[in-house]
């Protein structure tokens, strides 16, 4: 079988199975535990469903907690400007993360010991800054609106 990765943007809030049945106006089936933890899930088209907590939390993360993951929607866009935006945002997120790590390293606040010499990370950051600069020039020439 072919493997798939599901990518969809949803809204959700915690809700027990019993509360979901009440919300829908349904009688709770005798073989279901109304105390089961889960989530009320609302899809883009307005469809609503309930998902058990474990299943939901394995499949979804809070968008604001993983900004890199949110760029996937632009990565698969047919519009090259949206794909460009994804490329730019991914690079910027990674650069800012590496920069924060190096700042913590300099302050003696890292909770791990890096395996590469500091100069390697400095070189990587310099390359990332150069790459970002080239992309920013393209933004100007290609009239791309970065919706950061």
What are these regions (language model features)?
Residues 40, 50, 110-111, 120-121:
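Alpha-helical interaction segments
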Residues 61-62, 107, 144:
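Sparse recognition of residues in long alpha-helices and their boundaries
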Residues 90-97, 138:
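Polytopic transmembrane helical bundles with strong interfacial aromatic enrichment
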Residues 94-117:
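Short E/K-rich amphipathic alpha-helical oligomerization segments
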